[in-house]
Amino acid sequence: MAFDMEEQFSEECVDSGIHEECGVFGAYDFDGNDIASTVYYGLFALQHRGQESCGIAVSDTNGPKKNIQVHKGMGLVNEVFSSENLEKLKGNISVGHVRYSTAGSSTRENAQPLVLNYYKGTLALAHNGNLVNALELREELEKTGAIFQTTIDSEVIAYHVAKERISSATAEEAVLAAMRKLKGAYSLIVMSPRKLIGARDPFGFRPLCIGKRDNTYFLTSETVSYTHLTLPTKL
C-alpha cells in the first residue's frame, strides 16, 4: 500500500504566512475491524500538515482492555506504513498523527500517537498545538517522580489525563479535568481501549472536525481528509 509521490516541495519553498503544524485523525467503526486502513488514508490526506513522522494506534473494543497496538516511525505516511504492518493493526477504533515539530526534537521517540500504560489501563493520544505552560506542568510532574520518554508537550497532556483518570469516573471526565490545567492552543484525540474522545482548547484556536459515514465516526484536523472518504461534515 504505497503511493508514488513524484513531486516534493523544495526546502527552498518557505511558507511565511499563517499555517498549521501536525494533523490528527481518529475513527470509530461500530461494524468492522480494519479501521487502520481508513486512518492511513486519512493521514495521507493530512500529509501537508506534517512530514517528519507519523503513526497509528488501534484498539479492538471487543478485546482485552489493554489491547492498544501502535506503529509509528520517521518519514512520510507511505514510507512508514505498508500493507503488511497495517494488516497487523486489527481493531475498530483508531487514532493517527502526522508531525511537524514545533516543540521537541524531530526523533522517533517524539512521534505520535503516544501510548501510555498506567494504573487504570492504557491510553493513546494524538495532539496538535502548543502549550505555553508545558515546562511548568512538566516540572510539577517530575517533582512527583514522573519520568518522561519524550521532549514534547503531548506527553505532558497524556500524563495529566492518566493522572486524572485514576480519580475520575470516566475517561471523558479525566480529559476535561486535565484540560483545566492546560494553557495554549491545541486540539487532541484521546483513545482508550473502548472510547475515542476529541477535544480542543476553549477558544478553538486549533481545528477539530467531526464526521460520520454509516456506522463510522471520524475526528480530524481538516475536512480535506473527509473528501476522499466522501463523508458528510460537521464543524
Where are these regions (language model features)?
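A short, hydrophobic C-terminal helix/tail in secreted or cell-surface proteins
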Residues: 230-235
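Conserved short alpha-helical segments that host acidic/polar catalytic motifs at enzyme active sites
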Residues: 2-229
